[in-house]
UniProtKB/Swiss-Prot annotation:
GO molecular function, one term: structural constituent of ribosome
Protein name: Large ribosomal subunit protein uL4A
Comp. bias regions, Basic and acidic residues: 352-373
GO process terms (BP): translation
Quaternary assembly: Component of the large ribosomal subunit.
Subcellular location per the Swiss-Prot or TrEMBL entry: Cytoplasm
Region (Disordered) residue spans: 352-374
Stored SUPFAM superfamilies: Ribosomal protein L4
Cystine bridges: none
Gene name per UniProt: rpl4-a
Amino acid sequence: MAVSMACARPLISVYSEKGESSGKNVTMPAVFRAPIRPDIVNFVHTNLRKNNRQPYAVSKLAGHQTSAESWGTGRAVARIPRVRGGGTHRSGQGAFGNMCRGGRMFAPTKTWRRWHRRVNTTQKRYAVCSALAASALPALIMSKGHRIEEIPEVPLVVEDKVESYKKTKEAVLLLKKLKAWNDIKKVYASQRMRAGKGKMRNRRRIQRRGPCVIYNENNGLVKAFRNIPGITLLNVSKLNLLRLAPGGHVGRFCIWTESAFRKLDDLYGTWRKSAKLKADYNLPMHKMTNTDLTRILKSQEIQRALRAPNKKVKRRELKKNPLKNLRIMMRLNPYAKTARRHAILQQLENIKAKEKKPDDGKPKAKKPLDAKTKMIKLAKAKKRQAREAAKAAETK
């Protein structure tokens, strides 16, 4: 596959209907070197897609087509309006409220919602330029899921003779000769039933996207290609972002006719001249011509303007508690060692003095008793008194 340096080549080969190079070359249009901005593409795609919506709303009578009145207070039930009558399950049930079965929804939808979105023309063109630039990068095309392993070149340009095709079998043969039929087989393999309610709304089957054929003049080409699954047909003068970047993701596989490919410079211009077919439009330019930041920052011009790096390492000092660390305390207070030594000696002297102190015969102070001990002693004293009283009674 000759696509590794495709987007960097100044010339693109034109291929014949037999899938071989015709010998002609086309200059790579400048739009394929435009900045690729997925954020702008996604934003524009989201807003343009909203313009296809059909207004919808619930009926303004929904949930109110019954006779109901609140029972008021005093019945130990909620004050929600209740259906009148009897003899049926419906009578007495809550009505009207959004919390009731059969009631209206909260904030019923209206048809005068703001459905459409306006997008700046320049921003739309920027998104189209980004989508076209991404279609020239094989890595982005393959990441989108397109099967382009065997095609001869990216972007793929064919002769203008293709625009006069009128039969589908001619279009199928061309795709097979260009080795692009694998992408169509991928579409066939992806055909499946839609999940969800869309099956009931005439949207039963879904499938993947195939190649996008971009032409200059329709001399029967649309009828030849339109019945092939996954194929999208676009006129180069009416490029649509919703088709170039399905889902808001860049990297659509595009097949160009020669005249359409040559017309891109007139449509979008180059960085040296503005577009001929668009009024006052210039191709968006890259913010950086060289994206190698390492090379830029280490260049001599920038290094000369920078000051020398400050390599002094300032380490945080570990703070220690001087009340627990004697060495730190001595650094703060050199007398601390002497004071501590005096305190220890004084303590030793006090201990020795207590040991040498003679007993002067004075009664030692008794240790105060706790409540439990007091109660035990009091009980013993009462028992002793009772025994003495009993002995005295016996002697009498």
